[in-house]
Each structure stands twice: as C-alpha cells, then as structure tokens.
From Swiss-Prot:
Keywords: Coiled coil, ER-Golgi transport, Golgi apparatus, Membrane, Transmembrane, Transmembrane helix, Transport. Homodimer. Mediates endoplasmic reticulum to Golgi transport. One of its GO terms (cellular component) is endomembrane system. This is Syntaxin-5. It comes from Drosophila melanogaster. Pfam families: SNARE (PF05739). Residues 68-77 have a biased composition (Polar residues). It is found in: Golgi apparatus, cis-Golgi network membrane.
Amino acid sequence: MQTRRRLHQTDQQDYSSSSTYTIQEDQQGGAGAGSVGTGTAGGSVGLLAQSLVPPPTGHEAAIHIGDNYQSGDSISTPDYSDDKYGKAARQWNLRAFSGHALRTLSAAAAVVTGNQPGINNDSQSNYSYPASIPTSSQFYQSKEEPQETEPEPEIFVMAARDRTGEFANAIRSLQARNITRAVNIRDPRKAKQVQSYSEFMMVARFIGKNIASTYAKLEKLTMLAKKKSLFDDRPQEIQELTYIIKGDLNALNQQIARLQDISKDQRRHTNGKHLVSHSSNMVLALQSKLASMSTDFKQILEVRTENLKQQKTRRDQFSQGPGPLAAHTVSPSTAKQGSLLLSEENQAVSIDMGSSDTTPLLSTQTQMAIYDDSDNYVQQRAETMQNIESTIVELGGIFQQLAHMVKEQEEIVERIDTNVADAELNIEAAHGEILKYFQSVSKNRWLMIKIFGVLIFFFLFFVVFMS
C-alpha cells in the first residue's frame, strides 16, 4: 500500500511537470510547430504535421511523462495495464490526440470552404487567408490568357427635328375621325352634315392660303411695275409674275365656284339657318377678296402700260435727234481753230476719212442699226402690251363670273339686310319702351316715398302707445 501511494505521488508530479513542459514548448515553438494539449493551434500546417505523429502508448507514454529522466538513468518500467493511473494517462493522451485531430479537420474544412477565420498568434496579429490558393500552373495560365473585356455599348445620337406641326395635324385628323365615327353610330344624317361642313372648311382654308400667297406676288409686281427708270426695268420678271398671278386668279375662281357648290349641298341636307348663313357669308367674303385682288391687278397692269408709253416717248425723243457720229465728228478746220496746245494731239489723233463720199454711207449704216434696235424694242413692248390687254380681258371674265355668283347670293344678301333692318327697328322700339318705363318710375317715386312714410308713422305709433 505504501509503495502504491509513493507511485501515485510520483505519477502526479510527473504529470504536472509534463503538462507544464508541453506548454513551454508550445510558447517557444511558435506558429510553425503547433501546440499540444491545452495550447492554441499555431497554424493549420503545424496542426497537420503534428497530427501525423502517433500518440505515445504504454511504455512510451510513461517515459514521456517522467520529468527527471536522463540518458544515463535506468528506469524501471512497471506494468500499468491493470493500474488505474496508467488508464488515466492513456485516456488523457487519447483525449488530447482526439482534440488535435478535430481542430486539424476543422482548419482543413475552413481552408477548403473558404470560411477560414483570422488566426491569432503570440503577437496577437490577425491574418486572413484567401479562400483558395492557386497553383503555379493555374497562375501562369491566368497570365497567358487575355482578359475578355465587355464591348462598350454603342450610343446612337438622333438629330433633333421639330415635328410639332405634324403631331397637331395628326391629332386633328384623329379627332375628326372620332367625331365622324361617333356621329355615324348615333345618326347618319348628322354624320353627313359634319362631313360636308369639314370639307367646306378645308376648301375655304385652302382658298385663304392661296389668296394670301397671291397678294404677296401682287405686291412684288406692284413694286416692279411702278419703277419708271429705263436702266432698272425688268420686263422678263414682270411678265413671269403677270402670268403666274393670272393663273392663280383663274384657279381661285374655280375653287370659289367649288366652294359655292359645297354650300349649296349644305343647304339641301341641312336645316340649320346659322350654318347655312355662315357658309354663304364665307363664300361672299372670299369672292369679295378675289374681286378686290383682281381690281388691284388690273390697276397695276394699267400703270405698267402707262410706264411703257412714257418710256417709248422718251426713247423716240432720243432716237430722232442727230446721230452719234454727226454729233461727234470734228472737221479739220475746227480742229485747227482749237487750242494751240492740243494741235499736235489733234493732228496725231485725227483720222483722214478720205473723200467726203464715205461719211454719208457710215451715217446711214448707223442709223439703220439704231432703227433695227428700236424696232425690236417696239415689238417687245407691243407684245407686252398685248399680254396686258389679254390679261385685262380675262380679268373682265373673272369679274363677270363673280357678278354671277353675287347675283345668285342676292336673295341671301337681301335677307341679311332685311334682318338687320328689323333688328334695328326692334332695338329702337325697345329703347322707347325703356324710356317710357323710366318716366313712369320717376313719376311714382313720390308716391313710394309717401307710402314708406305712412308705414313708418304707423310703426312708431303702435310701438309708442301700445307699449
């Protein structure tokens, strides 16, 4: 029993010394060798290397636990197979080995999954390891492979364009279609009326635009026709403008006739008086504008004819005078009678015409050339005047058509006049009635004051005496 107690005490001392020895080795070894027992793991590589060392068993464990062991000492190896202290030592070694193995496996799993936490060493500095460490072949392969860059998106820039007018026209057309469809669903007769009215307004608007453009051309022709200078005369441009304006007037006359036909159709299919009167008034206004424009055009053509006549008289005056050679010929006697300083120059410049028989020939040739030019000019002016006369005749035909249209609308105009006269009479009668009522009210004012005074008197009487 005593020997067993001694052995138990020595075993406890050996166990405490071995545990402190292993802790000191862990502190000296650092992160490279790893820790055994209760020390923290220095790194996953050290743990893996340490896990490969088999744990001491049996006799080796007893030798490793002894602290006072030296190389020369002889230690008796007792049998711990049945001793409870030997079993405790083996269990402790097995527990330490299993703890190291579990920590090693957890570190390896963290390395594989990429969730390895930072490892605390003796200097208490945190280290973070990558989730996966590439090999050398993978590293060089990643360098050799070119990196695929995503293509930059192409930016398409569209030119700006103002299409507000087109948008407004599209909306108007859609609105007109919707109105027509709605009216078609409800009443086909009203749909026809709306369609005819829209057609009438479209034609009237087109005629108004054409009249405005023709007025602009007429103003330009007026500016050109009123010029009286011979050098700033542009007959070709005037003729072109005259021809264009004449065609525009004919086209406008035809368009107004079409508009009048549309208004007649409206009268047949429409019972409303206001719509009929509106359409007839618009036709009459457009006809009056066309008539005034035709009158202005006729006056401009008359002004142009007057200017042409004046230019012709001026040209005739200058062409009937002495010829240019006759006016500028200098006889040798007059040259000699001139200045003595210019005598040499006159002698050098003067040309001897030879005999006097050649001078009449030259004068007749120049006169014939002048006459030919004047004849061409007169022919051009005659053609211009003929064109003007034909245009005036066509304008007379347009006036006749306008007069016929006005004659057709005479009844409507008379109705408008009678309605205006009736309205004026009614307004005058209403004014007279209002004056009569005002006079009657002004006469009865004193009566109203008397009645009001009597009421106040009775009120005061009852209030004073009844109270």
